[in-house]
Design a protein with these regions (language model features):
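N-terminal cap/leader regions of alpha/beta-hydrolase-fold enzymes
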Residues: 1-230
Length: 230
């Protein structure tokens, strides 16, 4: 895997993104959308993992308009800072930035195939919104917070979309999961998986809530989903 930060032009400005390339050079593309903690070492590791799986992976800096290249840990003051940055983020502009990142990927010679978004936590909601805005060809939302408050967008999503939820997520109660499921009832493009005993952030090896079984299972399901749709 070859990885580096790149500049992505947007209007008269640029924002950063962490780009990880597969060893074979070419592949379909995934946009890895950060949590509230920035494109930190864990998100970069996720991009590297997908590059090792043969994808061109790009993790755009979602918070660049407020504070570029922020790198936060998961507790205390860093967590408070992440919540503050999320609240300052214009979701519409963030989705537009994801679209810009997708276009940047499509223009790269290494990208052969479609572009999917995989988002975690706040990034899961952004992946959902990016699909609704037709910015990506498929989307995966890991414990996407707030999706239940944006169900007016569900009807706009015609692309394949995969939802991973944790059974014991204090931020996303099971009734919220049921609301999202109900919005996609009878639709063939949406898949849902609930992970028993898992908590919010179960995919992150740097968090106390990391759950190896749920993480491995969700990663396998995501790879199968990507193999079918990108």
């Amino acid at each position: 895997v070859t990885a580096q930060w790149i500049d992505i032009p947007t209007g008269n400005d640029t924002f950063g993104g962490y780009l990880a390339l597969p060893k074979r050079g070419k592949g379909p593309a995934v946009i890895i959308i950060q949590e509230i903690f920035g494109v930190n070492s864990h998100i970069r590791a996720v991009a590297d993992q997908y590059a090792a799986d043969g994808f061109v992976a790009l993790a755009p800096d979602v918070f660049w308009r407020t504070q570029p290249r922020v790198e936060l840990t998961y507790e205390g003051a860093d967590r408070d800072k992440g919540i503050e940055l999320m609240k300052k983020t214009d979701v519409g502009l963030a989705v537009a930035d994801i679209g810009t990142a997708a276009d940047a990927l499509r223009a790269r010679p290494e990208v052969a195939g479609k572009v999917a978004a995989i988002g975690y936590c706040f990034g899961g909601q952004l992946a959902y919104r990016a699909a609704a805005a037709a910015k990506v060809d498929a989307a995966v939302a890991y414990y996407g917070g707030g999706i239940q408050n944006a169900l007016d967008l569900a009807g706009k999503i015609t692309q394949p979309i995969l939802f991973h939820y944790a059974e014991n997520d204090h931020g996303i109660p099971l009734d919220a999961v049921e609301q999202v499921k109900a919005a996609f009832a009878g639709r063939q493009n949406a898949s849902f998986h609930l992970y028993p005993g898992a908590e919010h952030g179960f995919n992150c090896t740097d968090r106390a809530s990391y759950n190896q079984r749920a993480s491995a299972l969700a990663h396998g399901r995501t790879l199968t989903f990507l193999a079918e749709h990108v």
